[in-house]
């Protein structure tokens, strides 16, 4: 599940973290 709650730049890091 991916969380795009962060900024566009941090969104990429968030996706890997949400894994």
UniProtKB/Swiss-Prot annotation:
Annotated Gene Ontology cellular component terms: extracellular region
Record has Ribosomal protein as a keyword: no
Post-translational events: Conversion of fibrinogen to fibrin is triggered by thrombin, which cleaves fibrinopeptides A and B from alpha and beta chains, and thus exposes the N-terminal polymerization sites responsible for the formation of the soft clot.
Keyword Coiled coil: yes
Subcellular location: Secreted
Keywords, comma-separated and alphabetical: Adaptive immunity, Blood coagulation, Coiled coil, Disulfide bond, Hemostasis, Immunity, Innate immunity, Secreted
GO biological process per UniProt: adaptive immune response; blood coagulation; innate immune response
Quaternary data: Heterohexamer; disulfide linked. Contains 2 sets of 3 non-identical chains (alpha, beta and gamma). The 2 heterotrimers are in head to head conformation with the N-termini in a small central domain.
General function of this protein: Cleaved by the protease thrombin to yield monomers which, together with fibrinogen alpha (FGA) and fibrinogen gamma (FGG), polymerize to form an insoluble fibrin matrix. Fibrin has a major function in hemostasis as one of the primary components of blood clots. In addition, functions during the early stages of wound repair to stabilize the lesion and guide cell migration during re-epithelialization. Was originally thought to be essential for platelet aggregation, based on in vitro studies using anticoagulated blood.
Domain notes: A long coiled coil structure formed by 3 polypeptide chains connects the central nodule to the C-terminal domains (distal nodules). The long C-terminal ends of the alpha chains fold back, contributing a fourth strand to the coiled coil structure.
Name recorded for this polypeptide: Fibrinogen beta chain
Biological source species: Vulpes vulpes
């Amino acid at each position: 599940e991916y969380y795009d709650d962060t900024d566009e730049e941090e969104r990429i890091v968030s996706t890997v973290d949400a894994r």
